[in-house]
Curated annotation (Swiss-Prot):
Keyword Protein biosynthesis among UniProt keywords: no
EC class name: transferase
GO biological process, one term: phenylacetate catabolic process
Keywords: Acyltransferase, Cytoplasm, Fatty acid metabolism, Lipid degradation, Lipid metabolism, Transferase
Subunit architecture: Heterotetramer of two alpha chains (FadB) and two beta chains (FadA).
GO molecular function: acetyl-CoA C-acyltransferase activity
Catalytic activity of the protein: an acyl-CoA + acetyl-CoA = a 3-oxoacyl-CoA + CoA
Pathway assigned in UniProt: Lipid metabolism; fatty acid beta-oxidation
Entry's family note: Belongs to the thiolase-like superfamily. Thiolase family.
Cellular component GO terms held in the UniProt record: cytoplasm
Organism whose genome encodes this protein: Alcanivorax borkumensis (strain ATCC 700651 / DSM 11573 / NCIMB 13689 / SK2)
Gene responsible for this protein: fadA
Primary location: cytoplasm
Subcellular location: Cytoplasm
Protein name per Swiss-Prot or TrEMBL: 3-ketoacyl-CoA thiolase
Amino acid sequence: MSLNPKDVVIVDAVRTPMGKSRNGQFRHVRAEKLSAQLIQALMARNPNWDIQLTEDVIWGCVNQTKEQGMNIARNISMLAGLPRTSAAQTVNRLCGSSMQALHSASQSIMTGNGDVFVIGGVEHMGHVAMDHGIDLNPEMSKVTAKASNMMGLTAEMLGKMHGITREQQDAFGVRSHKLAWEATQQGRWDNEIVPIEGHDQNGHKVLCEIDEVIRPGASIEDMQKLRPVFDPANGTVTAGTSSALSDGASAMLVMSAERAQALGLKPRAKIRSMAVAGCDAAIMGYGPVPATQKALARAGLTIDDIDYVELNEAFAAQSLPVAKDLKLLDKMEEKVNLNGGAIALGHPLGCSGARITGTLLNVMEWKDGQIGLATMCIGLGQGIATIIERV
């Protein structure tokens, strides 16, 4: 297909394997190092990339303190060996942070404010807990439900509103692990995972090449044994149907089509449209629905035009209502999360947006699809969506 000079193209996308946050393979590896090694991998994989042209490094990260503080994007940029003349910024749209990084870079390219960007995100939830240092304002209870900051309870609420059963959630959780492990065994992650040095259970250095969060033997019987964790008396959401805490990073090289052509780089996809949207904080998991509807309208598409979808699996009780209202529930096995999702891989908050977009691109190449949708929910009631098209 023909490209316009200012079309935003994705040249490459990579990620780390996902590590368990509790005594996992990256327990002795810092967030900056996970990220810097991805940028170095992008350099190695794309030797025609003139790094001197890099305008900005935009990195998503949610809890920006401790090793993730002091503008981690700039620290990553310098550790990776990018020129000092390239700028760097860290962005925070909670779970959608690294997808927002992609949007911010795309908007800059579209408006002529730079040609070459490195975007990505990271969260080391083993080193910096999700709630570390958080001081919530009690006055928030005047404007939204008191449980709006408790993600598991928002999933319970959304699931109840849409009649999602415990059995449906358990089946969805097993599906995620099954598909993710199949993808591992069949090498479908190989083009996106960059092996990273970590440590085994005995503390010995090892090269980490697979997602350690996946449970290959996950079964319905095992899921049924788990108790609800957020609403023990009446709930349906368990640890097995929630995204795991994990450590990981993701990265993309994006630029204008004219710059990619000038450098002799072959784009893999272009950005068709982008959108963010708000929803009630008490059902924050619903955000992908209005965000996707906006993105589809901006691209002049309908959901039937989308070949493949990556929907971040914060919770099964959240993902299923979104799939239902996007008219995807009957097409799950054909086009949604064909390599599993965050229930199996975990959800390192700042990492996930670029991760699912990169995974979407690889699924589209594997299945020879043309148009794909990546979308995710965001805490306190937001959604974000990106539509890409292969070129």
